[in-house]
Amino acid sequence: MSSTDDKPRKVQKTEAEWRAQLDPMQFEVTRHGATERAFTGKYADHWQEGVYHCVGCNAPLFDSGTKFDAGCGWPSYFQPLRGEIIDRVVDRSHGMVRVEVRCQDCGAHLGHVFPDGPEPTGERYCINSASLGFEPRK
């Protein structure tokens, strides 16, 4: 687990390119590490079957079958589709030590992972809706 985002990414864009692609909330969350307010994101209470993907690069991140209601106001999942698609980064902001999760392909801030999730992993990936897109299962 690293403490900085210094690794090369598959998808690299300028700030202007990210701003043109993303809406203002998506940009602040994914590129500056902001957090949307609890219970306001479009996927907080979304239960359709399918795959949630990175809004920045479309990398598939979470299957709807791993989503659960954590009662926290953000979409929560107990595991990513593939462990290697998520980077874990030590986050020491706001006087806390947490584990930030980012998209490995484009470096988008997704949210944080906590050790209080359900079986089988015991982890809770607490993810901002603004960092996600969704593809329904066919």
Swiss-Prot record:
One of its GO terms (molecular function) is zinc ion binding. Residues 15-137 form the MsrB domain. Keywords: Metal-binding, Oxidoreductase, Zinc. Its EC number is 1.8.4.12. It catalyses: L-methionyl-[protein] + [thioredoxin]-disulfide + H2O = L-methionyl-(R)-S-oxide-[protein] + [thioredoxin]-dithiol. InterPro entries: Met_Sox_Rdtase_MsrB, Met_Sox_Rdtase_MsrB_dom, Mss4-like_sf. GO terms for cellular component: cytoplasm. Belongs to the MsrB Met sulfoxide reductase family. NCBIfam families: peptide-methionine (R)-S-oxide reductase MsrB. This is Peptide methionine sulfoxide reductase MsrB. It comes from Methylibium petroleiphilum (strain ATCC BAA-1232 / LMG 22953 / PM1). The gene is msrB.
